[in-house]
Amino acid sequence: MAESEKLDVSKLTDIEIKEKIDVTRRELFDLRFQRATRQLNETHRFKKARVQLAQLLTAQGERSRSNT
């Protein structure tokens, strides 16, 4: 993943992170559905969404641990 494509979660607020997590989970659901019905042509989007979700969840966990 190129440096310009990486998600910079350090600049996001907690609310924005939560919203992005919800959006990314919905995107993964849609991609899984497309894959199951063999309509998914851009398979790289699946990996990108999983990586983005992992980054967001990690940032959310780090912030919750640092706030307590």
Curated annotation (Swiss-Prot):
Keyword Ribonucleoprotein listed: yes
MF term (GO), any: structural constituent of ribosome
GO annotation, biological process: translation
UniProt cross-references to InterPro entries, sorted A to Z: Ribosomal_uL29, Ribosomal_uL29_sf
Endpoints of the signal sequence: none
Gene Ontology CC: ribonucleoprotein complex; ribosome
Pfam families: Ribosomal_L29
Name this protein carries in UniProt: Large ribosomal subunit protein uL29
Organism: Prochlorococcus marinus (strain SARG / CCMP1375 / SS120)
Lineage: Bacteria, Bacillati, Cyanobacteriota, Cyanophyceae, Synechococcales
UniProt gene name: rpmC
